[in-house]
Amino acid sequence: MPELPEVETVRAGIANHSLGRPVRAVRVVDARSLRRHLTGPAHFEAALTGRVLRGAYRRGKYLWLTLSEADGTLADEALVVHLGMSGQLLVRDEPGRDLGSDSGNDLQARAAFDEQPRHLRVALELGPAGATGDAVSTNRACTGQRLLFVDQRIFGGMFLSPMVPDVPAVVAVNEAAAGEVSERFLVPEAVKHIARDPLDEFFDPAAVRRKFLRTSSGIKKVLLDQSVISGVGNIYADEALWRARLHYAKPARTLSATQTRELLEAVTQVLRESLAAGGTSFDALYVNVLGESGYFARSLNAYGRAGEPCHRCAEAGRTSLIVREPFQNRSSYRCPHCQRAPRSRQVEGSR
């Protein structure tokens, strides 16, 4: 499943290539990808057509595009995208006209633009970019574009959700004084329950620590709880726990303040490093908007390395092999020397 780095990579791609473009038409190929848009495909198509892609935002694994009305004002709802297990957002730029209509290059480019990807679910036909508000792209392409939602397993989807305020306490007073909540502090109603992620400028480690202290669940289960800390999935949870030398079943409430700080630092470092590498791609299901794979898989220390030497132990002259253990219908990877099991592993969330 795409986690924070993969979704952020897609968000950045949309921000660079698609903002400021009007939606000329919407084609719903498979209505199953609109299961969360309760008013149906016809309403989805009508509500998007004529609006302009204004801003690209993310919280955890959720991505949303704010919209402008024809007069440039901010629309009261946003287009929410969840990639699920295998979702992709792909950008296809319409070829220019400078090569001549009978040019072989022009025909090849047109054929690539018109090609429909396998597992295409929703297609947005976008017009040329133009200045429509504060959060617009610097890419002023004069040709059209297609924004394609492709999803092999159909666990992801798209839907429109009303925008609601979600102002951090540290800025709430200033926002109230201004009399109007700025766009950066508006989120889709469907996303508001999602906790802020470690790359959010208003992420609050102290609040996360308080949540840890209230639960006896294993720490990995808590890391995967998007209402506690968002954006972390199985891969990055295992990687962060390896760096922090913590067993996945250690009860969250037993972590010391130092262990909590080190774990959250490890989570943040892993996410930043993966983001810099374009995310983790184990197969063709995860790509950026241009169809390119990330390469953080080359840097993994625990996840997917069962039977291979622990890098840290090897550096210390020890031999310890990464083990794979069952965890909530999936797997956990750890070093049995660096990440020793707690005295009693029979805690909630350890399996």
PLM region spans:
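Structured catalytic/nucleic-acid-binding cores of DNA maintenance enzymes
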Residues: 1-351
